[in-house]
């Protein structure tokens, strides 16, 4: 597969993938394809894919429906939860509307309670995610994955075979490998593309309803980026920033813009929509495929885990491999687990990796754009 279009046009196509998928969703439903929506990187999408379902990301990233959500939820709750619930309650999210079932998980307290309210108007299946990563937790998580499979079989009157699951694992692994290849173009110094363009592809790929298309499209994009870089097309050398913290997208892209409008370049994202979601593969050759899926997903380093060594391991590797000059952590207001973990992250970045760190706390409004630009510009100037 070869890309004929110019790179900016390709990046915009990925940026518009969410809107495109709105239209495709109705076509899928008309054909009778089941749709399974989810809110979290811990969602083992291969199980739903194995029965022929389309999987879609539901997390909302706009403050549009927060006032409606606050009629049921407290004002001092994380904006991601309020926005997600608001879009679901008002039927303003086509993905939620067309989902036959929504899969939740016991990550943070706010989400757990949100799923209770959401289940009043939608089929919601909540997976019991352990908040630790030891052997006993792994046993529980494997049982939950099998319970999810059995729920889908009963709900949709289908049989999900091990062979179906292995096929889905292979498709998703190929997508992860391709996205990781894309990620790695940012190891070049100077970078071939902006961090915002990288993010458009990463975020847009989460709304691809046909997961088997991702690998081919992204690999072709990487080939084009590398060819243009080899011919001398690249950005100027800039301070290299790693973004970590809460899920990023939509309204919070203001943080990426603040970095890149003020002389920096985002070379890597440790967040859920970034390296966390593509760093590990499922072992396709494992004798027990459900055990392999459980191991891969439980190893994700989220702040809901106690302790949370995998987040620090991944961040340390990213800092080294991407020659990071500074780490920017974005925490959402009232996200307790990420806010609490900022102290440990700051210490790790400053003392173990020996580079500067800044934490910015924000929400889904645009009211703090000026303040963000001021703080982030000062941070980049210091590097």
Where does each model-flagged region fall?
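Redox- and metal-dependent alpha/beta enzyme cores, enriched for Fe-S-associated oxidoreductases
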Residues: 47-61, 68-69, 246-307, 311-318
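An N-terminal, globular interaction/scaffold subdomain
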Residues: 35-89, 114
């Amino acid at each position: 597969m070869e890309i004929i279009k110019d790179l900016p046009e390709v990046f915009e196509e990925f940026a518009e993938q969410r809107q495109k998928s709105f239209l495709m969703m109705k076509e899928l439903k008309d054909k009778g394809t089941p749709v399974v929506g989810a809110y979290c990187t811990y969602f083992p999408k291969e199980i739903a894919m194995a029965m022929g379902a389309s999987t879609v990301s539901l997390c909302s990233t706009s403050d549009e429906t927060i006032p409606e959500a606050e009629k049921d939820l407290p004002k001092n709750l994380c904006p991601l939860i309020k926005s997600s619930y608001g879009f679901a309650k008002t039927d303003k999210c086509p993905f939620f509307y067309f989902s036959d079932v929504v899969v939740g998980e016991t990550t943070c307290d706010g989400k757990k309670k949100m799923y209770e309210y959401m289940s009043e108007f939608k089929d919601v299946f909540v997976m019991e995610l352990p908040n630790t990563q030891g052997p006993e937790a792994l046993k529980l998580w494997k049982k939950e994955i099998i319970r999810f499979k059995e729920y889908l079989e009963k709900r949709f009157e289908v049989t999900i075979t091990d062979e179906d699951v292995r096929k889905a694992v292979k498709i998703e692994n190929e997508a992860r490998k391709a996205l990781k290849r894309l990620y790695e173009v940012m190891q070049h110094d100077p970078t071939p593309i902006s961090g915002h363009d990288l993010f458009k592809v990463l975020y847009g790929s989460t709304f691809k309803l046909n997961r088997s298309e991702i690998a081919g499209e992204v690999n072709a994009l990487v080939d084009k980026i590398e060819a243009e870089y080899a011919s001398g097309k690249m950005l100027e050398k800039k301070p290299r920033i790693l973004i970590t913290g809460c899920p990023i997208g939509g309204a919070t892209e203001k943080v990426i813009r603040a970095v890149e409008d003020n002389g920096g370049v985002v070379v890597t994202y440790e967040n859920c929509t970034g390296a966390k979601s593509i760093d590990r593969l499922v072992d396709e050759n494992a004798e027990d495929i459900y055990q392999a899926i459980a191991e891969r997903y439980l190893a994700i380093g989220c702040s809901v885990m106690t302790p949370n060594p995998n987040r620090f391991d991944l961040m340390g590797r990213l800092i080294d491999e991407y020659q990071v000059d500074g780490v920017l952590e974005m925490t959402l207001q009232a996200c307790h687990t990420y806010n609490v973990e900022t102290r440990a992250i700051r210490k790790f970045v400053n003392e173990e990796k020996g580079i500067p760190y800044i934490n910015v706390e924000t929400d889904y409004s645009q009211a703090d754009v000026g303040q963000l630009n001021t703080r982030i510009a000062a941070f980049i100037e210091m590097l």
